[in-house]
């Protein structure tokens, strides 16, 4: 079963921490083909889901945009956000920030491959030999360490994607955009905040990886023996359905972490910033209500469905034309 263990803690948004790493016996040529085809898969699925992804980010971060004077009034929902974005910025604007998101796949997968074996050897516990809790703890530790290590190198791309996606035409200032592209995001952030501006929210993102993995594996191991019994044990659809429900359940439970990290990103270059992720966790619910931590969660679920649907169709095309399915590009 495919495991979506990404940082869009959505974070957690959708990059498997150990996905698409080639088996040790696979040659360099085959790895290169898998790597590139996985990149095509990632580009296809991410580009198809990009409009929903941008709407999710706009709804999630709208309160920071209002504070900065870049949004005149809150969005009333997914449909309202789609309509206003297309009306104010044009249909093509729904893909704003997607290029950075697609580019992020390649270094993420290369880094995952580089780190995965090292951390798996370091926390190499077996469930049947060492017991469930050692295996569970080792899984969290290895996944968290590998995810954080990879994230350190690609976080600025995630930051850039977030700022571009939330760069709606200003409600004040004649409809001007704040950034002209990814390079401009880096240039202005470094000028105003230095390197720290590119990594705002990084610490809570690392926590999010561990929380998501803990919820995912904890729920799966608890529910599988209870729900998948009898004929359901060999039913692939039942296994997929359980995995899908748990993936979305873990993603929804850890969604506030994604909201906090992205809203911290949005304060780079602004006069008022959160002192820390804990300060953000306290301020946001206190001023806006607890539900503000879940803004955009509905769009996030739709994004996952759209991405998975397109990816499934693309996988079938690969089998039809190449006789096999390459890496699924989940990063």
Curated annotation (Swiss-Prot):
Q: Where are the Solcar repeats?
A: 29-122, 134-226, 238-320
Q: Give the record's GO CC terms.
A: mitochondrial inner membrane
Spell out the molecular function terms from Gene Ontology: ATP:ADP antiporter activity
Q: How does it sit in the membrane?
A: Multi-pass membrane protein
Activity control, as annotated, is: The matrix-open state (m-state) is inhibited by the membrane-permeable bongkrekic acid (BKA). The cytoplasmic-open state (c-state) is inhibited by the membrane-impermeable toxic inhibitor carboxyatractyloside (CATR).
The family assignment reads: Belongs to the mitochondrial carrier (TC 2.A.29) family.
Notes concerning its domains: The transmembrane helices are not perpendicular to the plane of the membrane, but cross the membrane at an angle. At least 2 of the odd-numbered transmembrane helices exhibit a sharp kink, due to the presence of a conserved proline residue.
**What is the designated name of this protein?**
ADP,ATP carrier protein 2, mitochondrial
What is the source species? Triticum aestivum (Wheat)
Question: What taxonomic lineage is listed for the species of origin?
Answer: Eukaryota, Viridiplantae, Streptophyta, Embryophyta, Tracheophyta
Gene name of the encoded protein: ANT-G2
